[in-house]
């Protein structure tokens, strides 16, 4: 973190309206739509983090209200009153010192039904000079898979997608590297039984 830089504690409108974020959310929602485990509509959902435009997209897809969280995800319990058949955590764990804590808390909040799912996305590892200064972790696939297993989840399916347009790649050497390395990993996870 550079001098004077502070971490964002709430999502602001300017950040939410960024076309890159909207593209990520659309691709994430397309992945969610591909799940055959959940019967629609579901009774309730939990979106980890503040309410964003993707929360409304999830509500429209699943046909229910999605609650959001407002606790310190590194240290505090989620303290939810209900158990959810679907939980989403899109690009959250890379911002945490202790992502295992959050995954264990999500497992407690997930409904025990075999069809319940956690949809999780995070940036794929990239060289240090391309990593975001706002991220504590950009994990290699094997480390992320180990974290998921340690938290008691199994991978139902996964995918990876790029977040840059082809024209962006032609703007220079560093943009070309970003097109090659800057990818999002997304998972559909089920609690191990």
Regions found by a protein language model. Name each.
Residues 96-97, 110-114:
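Helix-to-beta-strand junctions that scaffold the AdoMet/dcAdoMet cofactor pocket
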Residues 150-153:
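A structural motif corresponding to the C-terminal end of an alpha-helix
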Residues 126-132:
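A short acidic, helix-capping loop that chelates divalent metal ions and anchors anionic groups
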Residues 1-86, 90, 100-105, 116, ...:
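Conserved N-terminal segment of class I S-adenosyl-L-methionine
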Residues 91, 95:
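A short His-aromatic
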């Amino acid at each position: 973190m550079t001098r004077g830089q502070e971490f964002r504690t709430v999502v602001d409108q300017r950040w939410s309206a960024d076309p890159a974020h909207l593209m990520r959310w659309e691709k994430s929602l397309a992945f969610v739509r591909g799940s055959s485990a959940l019967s629609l509509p579901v009774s309730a959902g939990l979106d980890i983090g503040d309410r964003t435009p993707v929360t409304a997209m999830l509500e429209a897809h699943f046909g229910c209200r999605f609650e959001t969280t407002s606790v310190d995800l590194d240290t505090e319990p989620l303290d939810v009153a209900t158990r959810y058949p679907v939980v989403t955590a899109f690009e959250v764990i890379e911002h945490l010192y202790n992502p295992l804590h959050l995954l264990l808390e999500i497992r407690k909040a997930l409904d025990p039904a075999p069809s319940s799912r956690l949809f999780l996305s995070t940036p794929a590892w990239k060289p240090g000079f391309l990593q975001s200064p706002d991220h504590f972790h950009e994990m290699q696939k094997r480390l992320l898979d180990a974290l998921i297993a340690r938290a008691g989840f199994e991978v139902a399916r996964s995918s990876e997608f790029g977040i840059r347009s082809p024209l962006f790649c032609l703007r220079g050497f560093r943009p070309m590297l970003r097109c090659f390395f800057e990818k999002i990993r997304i998972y559909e996870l089920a609690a191990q039984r």
